[in-house]
Protein backbone atom coordinates (compact mmCIF):
# COMPACT_ATOMS: atom_id res chain seq x y z
CA UNK A 1 0.00 0.00 0.00
CA UNK A 2 0.99 3.60 -0.61
CA UNK A 3 1.66 5.67 2.51
CA UNK A 4 1.54 9.08 0.82
CA UNK A 5 -1.17 10.90 -1.17
CA UNK A 6 -0.91 10.25 -4.91
CA UNK A 7 -1.89 12.75 -7.56
CA UNK A 8 -4.82 11.96 -9.85
CA UNK A 9 -2.38 10.26 -12.24
CA UNK A 10 -3.66 7.66 -14.65
CA UNK A 11 -1.90 5.38 -17.09
CA UNK A 12 -2.08 8.26 -19.62
CA UNK A 13 -0.42 10.95 -17.47
CA UNK A 14 1.75 11.12 -14.41
CA UNK A 15 2.82 7.88 -12.80
CA UNK A 16 0.52 5.37 -11.21
CA UNK A 17 2.97 2.49 -10.71
CA UNK A 18 3.26 0.54 -7.49
CA UNK A 19 5.72 1.85 -4.89
CA UNK A 20 7.02 -0.03 -1.85
CA UNK A 21 8.87 1.58 1.05
CA UNK A 22 11.77 0.41 3.22
CA UNK A 23 12.46 2.63 6.24
CA UNK A 24 15.33 2.56 8.74
CA UNK A 25 15.30 5.47 11.18
CA UNK A 26 15.24 8.69 9.15
CA UNK A 27 16.38 6.93 5.94
CA UNK A 28 13.84 5.74 3.41
CA UNK A 29 14.12 3.78 0.17
CA UNK A 30 11.34 3.72 -2.41
CA UNK A 31 11.10 0.76 -4.75
CA UNK A 32 9.07 1.90 -7.75
CA UNK A 33 7.65 -0.12 -10.59
CA UNK A 34 9.59 0.49 -13.81
CA UNK A 35 7.76 2.57 -16.45
CA UNK A 36 9.53 3.19 -19.77
CA UNK A 37 6.89 5.65 -21.06
CA UNK A 38 6.40 8.09 -18.17
CA UNK A 39 8.70 10.76 -19.67
CA UNK A 40 6.93 10.66 -23.05
CA UNK A 41 3.48 10.81 -21.42
CA UNK A 42 4.56 13.92 -19.51
CA UNK A 43 6.49 15.64 -22.32
CA UNK A 44 9.77 15.39 -20.38
CA UNK A 45 13.27 14.31 -21.43
CA UNK A 46 14.23 12.49 -18.21
CA UNK A 47 12.50 9.31 -17.04
CA UNK A 48 13.10 8.82 -13.30
CA UNK A 49 11.46 5.38 -13.18
CA UNK A 50 13.25 3.87 -16.15
CA UNK A 51 16.39 2.81 -14.25
CA UNK A 52 16.24 4.41 -10.81
CA UNK A 53 17.59 7.54 -9.15
CA UNK A 54 18.71 9.05 -5.85
CA UNK A 55 16.69 11.82 -4.19
CA UNK A 56 17.35 14.83 -1.97
CA UNK A 57 14.97 17.20 -0.18
CA UNK A 58 15.13 21.00 -0.35
CA UNK A 59 13.25 23.82 1.34
CA UNK A 60 13.44 26.05 -1.76
CA UNK A 61 12.98 24.22 -5.04
CA UNK A 62 12.70 27.46 -7.03
CA UNK A 63 16.15 28.57 -5.86
CA UNK A 64 17.52 25.13 -6.71
CA UNK A 65 16.02 25.29 -10.21
CA UNK A 66 17.55 28.76 -10.67
CA UNK A 67 20.93 27.36 -9.58
CA UNK A 68 20.69 24.54 -12.14
CA UNK A 69 19.68 26.97 -14.91
CA UNK A 70 22.48 29.40 -14.02
CA UNK A 71 24.94 26.53 -14.43
CA UNK A 72 23.48 25.31 -17.72
CA UNK A 73 22.09 22.09 -16.24
CA UNK A 74 18.88 20.91 -17.90
CA UNK A 75 16.22 19.42 -15.67
CA UNK A 76 12.75 17.92 -15.99
CA UNK A 77 10.13 19.52 -13.74
CA UNK A 78 7.42 16.96 -12.98
CA UNK A 79 5.69 19.16 -10.40
CA UNK A 80 3.33 16.94 -8.40
CA UNK A 81 2.71 14.34 -11.16
CA UNK A 82 3.99 11.47 -8.98
CA UNK A 83 3.09 12.54 -5.44
CA UNK A 84 0.47 15.12 -4.51
CA UNK A 85 2.54 16.56 -1.65
CA UNK A 86 5.96 16.72 -3.37
CA UNK A 87 7.19 19.00 -6.17
CA UNK A 88 9.86 16.95 -7.94
CA UNK A 89 12.56 17.82 -10.47
CA UNK A 90 15.09 15.47 -12.07
CA UNK A 91 18.45 16.01 -13.75
CA UNK A 92 21.57 14.06 -14.70
CA UNK A 93 24.82 14.20 -12.74
CA UNK A 94 28.12 14.26 -14.70
CA UNK A 95 28.22 10.43 -14.67
CA UNK A 96 24.72 10.12 -16.17
CA UNK A 97 22.92 9.15 -12.96
CA UNK A 98 19.46 10.58 -12.43
CA UNK A 99 19.15 12.90 -9.43
CA UNK A 100 15.84 13.99 -7.90
CA UNK A 101 15.38 17.12 -5.80
CA UNK A 102 11.98 17.64 -4.21
CA UNK A 103 10.16 20.02 -1.90
CA UNK A 104 7.06 19.37 0.15
CA UNK A 105 4.11 21.48 -0.98
CA UNK A 106 1.15 22.57 1.11
Regions found by a protein language model. Name each.
Residues 1-28:
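Core segments of cupin and vicinal oxygen chelate
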Residues 26-29, 39-40, 96-98:
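Short, charged/polar, Gly/Pro-enriched secondary-structure boundary elements
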Residues 25, 32-34, 104:
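Generic beta-structure capping elements
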Residues 3-10, 37-42, 77, 84:
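A short, acidic/glycine-rich surface segment
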Residues 30, 53, 102:
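Histidine-centered active-site/metal-ligand motif
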Residues 19-25, 41-106:
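Vicinal oxygen chelate
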Residues 3-5, 51-56, 105-106:
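N-terminal beta-strand motif that seeds the catalytic metal site of vicinal oxygen chelate
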Amino acid sequence: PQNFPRSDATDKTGYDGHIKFATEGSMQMHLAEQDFDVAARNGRHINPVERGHIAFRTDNIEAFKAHLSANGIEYADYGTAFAAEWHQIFFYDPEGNIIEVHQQVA
